[in-house]
Amino acid sequence: PKDDQNFLKDWKNGNYPEGWGNKPVTWVSLEDARAYAKWAGKRLPHDWEWQLAAQGTDGREYPWGNTWDASRVPKPDKGRTMRAPDDGNAHPNGASPYEVMDLIGNVWQWTDEFQDEHTRAAILRGGSYYQPQGSVWYFPQAYRDDEHGKLLLMAPSYDRSAALGFRCVKDAK
């Protein structure tokens, strides 16, 4: 990337840490995630696609149904420093009606960019296990399928976070 500050911050010499092969990739900006998706022949999901994957067609509040169940998501981290995210597929009982895993509670997920004539922002979905106490900048959790965060995009180095990753989609043919 043009601005590599904090890019893949947990990685060393181009490699993820030992034992991290199944964890979400974090410390990537929206541009980084888009570049990877394009390289892989995919793209980032539109917000409505993420919503459909999480909610299905029956309007459920959470990917698994309408009743909150903390055992279906990673345990919250309320400390000052973040632990590593959970492995992908670590919570299979939290799958959506389409069997999509880890839609909520592991890391926030980039969706395609939101832009109007005044603002450049991105819609973030899924919420994160990281829930710092007393933080004035970190937006509240969004576990429900009908909740999201909106992040004002400043510069790639500011947009990268250990609590923010992405997933890719591919158009059906």
Task: Pin down the residues of each PLM region.
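Short, structured beta-strand segments at or near domain termini in extracellular proteins/domains
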Residues: 162-173
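Functional-site microenvironments in short loops/helix caps that host divalent-cation chemistry
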Residues: 6-150, 157-162
